[in-house]
Regions:
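Surface-exposed, charge/polar-rich loops and edge strands
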Residues: 2-42, 46-181
Length: 181
């Protein structure tokens, strides 16, 4: 059995796209996922499965289309995938920056095209790293946050809706859930 994280985008935000996590956990168990757990109400789901990632992407895609049609994109990765990305993070990720976020790639996203766009941004008081799971973004100063490419340009990206963003604290919590057995 492999432990997976499933990150869904845009649920329970501002009273829109409401999902009751206890119901979602039960529904995911009925389609064959084991040990389903959630963390906060923003779409951080953890489970175990003997199925391949490709099989799970297909299964979950059909499940969301049938039961939660507003969930149109999600990120799925294993505990091993997470550990590999964590091991390759640059030193600045461990520094005490004003803000740190991960822009997780969702399934089917053209990661190269997104990176090409993001890496061309004129970065101000910020730094980025391309990981296998997403783009790691650090902002050095809270005072200059509104002037950063992150604040000004990410929302305008054509593929913005195909990214799901988590802050560094949630990224760390994802790791804790993935290490459970």
């Amino acid at each position: 059995m492999t432990r997976f994280a499933l990150l869904v985008r845009g649920i329970n935000v501002g009273g829109k796209n409401k999902v009751v996590m206890t119901e979602l956990r039960e529904e995911l168990q009925t389609i064959g996922l084991d040990g389903v757990e959630t963390y906060i109400n923003s779409g951080n789901i953890f489970f175990e499965s003997a199925s391949s990632k490709a099989e799970l992407v297909d299964l979950l895609g059909h499940f969301f289309r049938d039961h939660y049609p507003f969930i149109q994109s999600f990120s799925l990765f294993s505990a091993e995938d997470y550990a590999q990305d964590l091991a390759s993070l640059p030193a600045w990720w461990q520094e005490d920056l004003a803000r740190k976020d991960v822009l997780f790639y969702t399934e089917g996203l053209d990661q190269d095209a997104v990176w090409e766009l993001v890496s061309a941004f004129s970065l101000g008081d910020e730094i980025i790293h391309r990981g296998n799971l997403g783009i790691y973004w650090g902002k050095y100063s809270e005072e200059t946050y509104t002037k950063t490419a992150y604040h000004r340009q990410v929302l305008k990206m054509p593929d913005y809706r195909l990214l799901t963003i988590r802050n560094a604290n949630t990224f760390d919590k994802i790791g804790q859930f993935l290490r459970k057995s």
